[in-house]
């Protein structure tokens, strides 16, 4: 029961902060639990660690921005709290399977 409250609180914090450069440690601290407790709770109830949940939210927004805006990759990475566009592009490619540019190009080709 308590674990579910922590997960819900974490997801709410992710929604509030996914455009900021926050760390898992920061969110765990705000919830009043350790990083290992947060990761254990996330793995148990959501099937993935806290950082992956945070990245999934950022990538969801990135896909939305790639689809509906003409923002550059640099602007997007900055908006989503990445310190470097290279880190954003690397994460996007690793999780989505293609680069942000290729994702946008594919969308344009389908229209």
Kindly give the residue locations of the regions a language model identified.
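Short hydrophobic/aromatic patch on the recognition helix
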Residues: 38, 87-88, 92
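Key DNA-contact positions within bacterial/archaeal DNA-binding proteins
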Residues: 36, 85-86, 101
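Residues within the alpha-helical elements of helix-turn-helix
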Residues: 30, 79-80, 95
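Terminal helix-turn-helix DNA-binding modules in bacterial transcription factors
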Residues: 44-89, 105-111
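Charge-rich, low-complexity intrinsically disordered segments
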Residues: 21-54, 60
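Basic, amphipathic alpha-helical hairpins
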Residues: 9-23, 42, 46, 63-72, ...
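Polybasic "coupling" helices that flank or enter modular domains
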Residues: 1-19, 29-35
């Amino acid at each position: 029961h308590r674990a579910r409250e922590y997960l819900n609180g974490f997801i709410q914090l992710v929604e509030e902060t996914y455009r900021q450069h926050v760390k898992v440690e920061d969110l765990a601290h705000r919830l009043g639990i350790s990083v290992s407790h947060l990761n254990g709770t996330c793995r148990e109830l959501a099937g993935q660690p806290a950082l992956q949940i945070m990245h999934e939210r950022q990538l969801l927004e990135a896909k939305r921005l790639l689809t509906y805006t003409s923002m550059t990759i640099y602007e997007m990475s900055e908006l989503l709290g990445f310190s470097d566009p290279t880190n954003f592009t690397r994460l996007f490619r690793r999780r989505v399977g293609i680069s942000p540019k290729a994702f946008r190009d594919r969308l344009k080709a389908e229209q």
